[in-house]
Design a protein with these regions (language model features):
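Mobile, glycine- and charge-enriched loop segments
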Residues: 63-65, 69, 84-90, 95, ...
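Generic secondary-structure signature for well-ordered alpha-helical cores
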Residues: 25-26, 40, 53-60, 115, ...
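Hydrophobic faces of well-ordered beta-strands that scaffold small-molecule active sites
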Residues: 65-71, 121, 152-156, 186-188, ...
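Conserved, mostly hydrophobic/aromatic
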Residues: 27, 51, 83, 123, ...
């Protein structure tokens, strides 16, 4: 269960609180102690209102909320990482469950996505012990030759580190080869909570926090668009959540000027159903108010990331709508196919009409976007 911090930031009276809010409105970088205060002590209504003011200053079209149509395809479910929060993966010897998606299956899924107005594949996969750089180069180049108009938003920092390791390459060279083969952008998958202790507890075999940061920085240096994520609500403390945000902010600050860097930040709640963490006694304890606090603090701490996404898939329609008034400006994708989070207990669904209606009900105008946040 979440081990909430009981320590409180000392000496934060009304005047100091106003100073912190003013700093947020100016989009100045917050100190760790200021960020802790926002998360642990700031009244939620004040916090959400301040985050909404910052959101309206950052995103020029005040009444617009963006959304996307893409399709998630799992390249394989074979994974040697053994993350304790995932019940979708299988081990290499579990041949009755193991799969690698075939080219015919990709074609069928892509044709269906295009018919629904989609423009992007979100390709996710495990750390397969036998799928190295040659496999991914062939996959990406083949898909691009067949569907040049489809963007490939694929893998994640852990997969890149794993491919590099089994292929005898550096992560930088691996990224270069993947980009040359057709990789358009890199998801923020595999971040979870960027804390070595948390990682040891929930995903001990996954590439390290340092490797995640290294791969993302190299992607930024290559001007490969990326996103950042946080999966919260398992074994982490509130301050480890804030520290995660500070690591993301500081990594974004290292992005070369004029490069894409992190285009968006997406926090989502851990779903425990059927996972090893659940067997260890760690269960989903979703609080809508806690999620709104996280969205608001994310907007205020991440002063250098423009887009904050409301994860309707894991929190549901109503909470996502409130998040749009608390710092978030994007509703993400209708996600034509999603398996990993759904297999752990998240069963919220939207079609194109439904997500637009949800945005309108929240008082905004829906606008369809692509991965670079360009309007379609």
């Amino acid at each position: 269960m979440i081990r909430e911090q009981t320590q409180r930031t000392a000496g934060t009276g009304p005047n100091r609180a106003e100073e912190i809010y003013e700093k947020c409105l100016k989009r100045d970088p917050l100190t760790a102690e200021e960020a802790y205060w926002l998360y642990e002590q700031a009244p939620l209504q004040e916090l959400a209102l301040t985050a909404d003011r910052v959101r309206r200053a950052v995103v020029p079209d005040l009444e617009v909320v963006t959304w996307q149509i893409d399709r998630t395809v799992n390249i394989t479910n074979v994974c040697i990482s053994g993350c304790h929060f995932c019940n979708f993966h299988c081990k290499p010897h579990q041949t009755e469950r193991a799969f690698i998606t075939t080219l015919d299956e990709y074609k069928e899924k892509i044709e269906r996505m295009l018919a629904l107005g989609g423009d992007q594949l979100l390709l996710q996969g495990g750390l397969h012990p036998k799928l190295g750089i040659d496999f991914y180069e062939e996959l990406f180049s083949t898909l691009k030759s067949l569907y040049p108009q489809v963007r490939l938003h694929a893998l994640g920092a852990p997969e890149v580190a794993h491919i590099a390791r089994i292929s005898g390459l550096t992560t930088l060279d691996t990224l270069k080869r993947l980009i040359a083969a057709g990789l358009d952008s890199l998801p923020g998958a595999g971040a979870e909570i960027l804390d070595p202790g948390v990682r040891k507890a929930i995903s001990p075999a996954k590439p390290s926090v340092e490797e995640w940061i290294q791969v993302m920085h190299e992607a930024h240096c290559l001007n490969l668009p990326t996103s950042a994520t946080m999966m919260y609500g398992h074994v982490e403390t509130s301050r480890q959540r804030v520290d995660h945000l500070l690591r993301i902010r500081d990594l974004q600050a290292r992005c070369p000027e004029g490069h894409y860097g992190f285009l968006a930040f997406i926090p989502w709640i851990f779903r425990s159903s059927g996972t090893e963490l659940e067997r260890q006694g760690v269960a989903t304890r979703f609080s809508p108010l806690e999620y709104i606090r996280i969205i608001a603090v994310s907007r205020l701490v991440l002063n250098n990331i423009r887009n904050i996404q409301a994860s309707w898939l894991t929190v549901g329609k109503a909470t996502a709508q409130v998040a749009l008034h608390s710092g978030a400006n994007d509703m993400g994708s209708i996600m034509i196919e999603e398996n990993v989070v759904s297999s752990a207990g998240a069963h919220n669904q939207f079609d194109a009409a439904g997500i637009q209606q949800a945005i309108r009900e929240a008082g905004f105008t829906p606008r369809l976007r692509d991965q670079l946040y360009r309007m379609r």
